[in-house]
Amino acid sequence: EPLLEILQRDDLAVTLLLFFSGLFTPCVRISADFLQVQDAYLQSETAAKGITDIVDLTPIRDMYSGGFYPFATPEEHWAYWSRYIYINRYMDAPKPVYDDLLKLVADKDYFVITTNIDHCFQKAGFDKKRLFYTQGDYGLFQCSEPCCQETFDNEKTVRAMVEAQGFTVADGVLTPPTDGTPTMAVPSELLPGCPHCGRPMTMNLRCDDKFAEDEGWHAAAERYENFLRTRDGQKLLFLELGVGYNTPVIIKYPFLRMTAGNPKATYACINMGQASTLREIEERSILIDGDITAVIEEMKKTASYK
């Protein structure tokens, strides 16, 4: 209730962070003869069917760790990654939490900074000019070198890759072939190459010092910094959802630091098992140790927008 009361104030700027670590994107774990979703947060039959054949042929047991698997050929590498990208970037989130979050902040002066790379915020209708995806975008390729700081839309290529493996795409849903298993390789002619230097392309994901920060990335970073700069000292809610300690220096630590430096700011954290704050700002912190979906759903029942 205290968090909802703050969100419903008329004089509030809201900085909203969302980092779902496998909570709402189909990060599926396969075990025994049943589908067991990673951390038990969602049932995603479509995602599970999308990698069942890979599970049978490799040690891969969930989609995230599969991203680090050393596939034998580029054709096999892109067979896996095309499915991963399509499921996590181009399919809708399996729960309406993004839509509910938008309803909570739509009439506020908000900004979203996220380390998610699935663009669920944008698909839910959040203002693109109020979003900063710090770690990249599943929907973009970049040069693996990189020879430039450009990125390239990949939806057409990714769709061609999954269809070449036998999947069908209808109404945004990826469906495995009904007669047999998918082909665990893509045609060589579909392998993406940099249009400038010819080197292999890779995903635009921040995993090393070769991450390409294109013009769009820098424009979003500047808008975020301007948002913070022009609201300095105002009533702010730093709402942190699902952030762990994998990369706390990007969002968690700055949110805590900015709350400590602004006596009019409130820090709110919803996190299963990791809701914590600094001792110096305990009186201006709201900590909810619980499932984000359940908390947002409860707020939805009470909020005036329902």
Where are these regions (language model features)?
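Conserved catalytic alpha/beta core of Sir2/sirtuin-type deacylases, generalized to analogous enzyme cores
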Residues: 1-306
